[in-house]
């Protein structure tokens, strides 16, 4: 009888371990990241809601933007062409549209029909420093 309890206990531990690994795998693969080819980026066009602000051609500034964008992960899907806000910045990176904005004292990067990424204030300020 005790032999059966030992087998049941080991089986329960094995099932728990398998479920934990499966859960971690599903969690890590369900996050969205921005898909782009950083090596191909020669220029980033920056727009406000109303007009074009500037072109970013500096490799250092482009690298700074790319470093921030490559870190982003999200589970929140974007279902809009652009943010429904009065103030935002639009970055045109090759064929990719990226929006940067603040809403309710939180900071976001949004890629239309892909994802909405929550960023921290220092990332937001760094992006604004580059795009303004």
Stretch-by-stretch model annotation:
Residues 2-132:
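Function-determining sites in protein domains
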């Amino acid at each position: 009888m005790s032999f059966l309890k030992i087998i049941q206990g080991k089986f329960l531990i094995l099932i728990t371990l398998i479920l934990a690994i499966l859960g971690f795998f599903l969690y890590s693969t369900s996050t969205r990241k921005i898909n782009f080819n950083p090596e191909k980026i020669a220029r980033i066009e920056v727009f406000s809601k109303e007009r074009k602000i500037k072109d970013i051609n500096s490799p250092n500034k482009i690298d700074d933007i790319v470093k921030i964008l490559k870190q982003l992960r999200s589970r929140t899907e974007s279902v809009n062409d652009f943010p429904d806000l009065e103030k935002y910045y639009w970055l045109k990176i090759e064929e990719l549209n990226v929006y940067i904005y603040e809403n309710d004292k939180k900071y976001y990067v949004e890629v239309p029909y892909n994802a909405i990424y929550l960023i921290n204030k220092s990332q937001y300020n760094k992006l604004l420093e580059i795009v303004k």
